[in-house]
Curated annotation (Swiss-Prot):
This is Pyridoxal 5'-phosphate synthase subunit PdxT. Keywords: Glutamine amidotransferase, Hydrolase, Lyase, Pyridoxal phosphate. The keyword Hydrolase applies. Pathway: Cofactor biosynthesis; pyridoxal 5'-phosphate biosynthesis. The gene is pdxT. It catalyses: aldehydo-D-ribose 5-phosphate + D-glyceraldehyde 3-phosphate + L-glutamine = pyridoxal 5'-phosphate + L-glutamate + phosphate + 3 H2O + H(+); L-glutamine + H2O = L-glutamate + NH4(+). NCBIfam families: PLP_synth_Pdx2 (TIGR03800). One of its GO terms (cellular component) is glutaminase complex.
Amino acid sequence: MSDTPVIGVLALQGDVREHLIALASADALARPVRRPEELAEVDGLVIPGGESTTMSKLAVLFGMMEPLRERVRAGMPVYGTCAGMILLAEKILDPRSGQETVGGIDMIVRRNAFGRQNESFEAAVEVGGVEGGPVDGVFIRAPWVESVGARTEVIAEHGGHIVAVRQENALATSFHPELTGDHRVHALFVDMVRAVN
């Protein structure tokens, strides 16, 4: 891998464009990923926000679920925001019928924990590993983490709830940093991808 990592954004649903822009601003070569062969060509992957049940079903429908699981198990760096966080969880406290996860982070999440769409909000969040003060977190029907395993590091909390975690090469936030123009969380992820190679 060159100094410029190739990072994909799972492009089944969600704010793909915003993640592509954030990754490019953090000095990565960013590209959408829709098929298993595209997944095989990236050094790391962002799983964006969206609707977690729909994303899970689309990943199965498009033949992406097993390749995603295999790459994450093999150590590919992965970053999930909001619904992406849910997909990276080992367990969902309140899953919808037919909802599957990729796994990769030893955590239990609660879907839509911060409320409905009209209860969305922005908040300053101190994120471990991100310098320069708090990041502006956009919480849209956001999950929170109920509990983590011994290998999972809590890197941010808001209102007494876990909203960002890291486990080895996996990162997850319940908020959307890509919607704010502050790309420091993406820069942290790009550094994680670089460190693997």
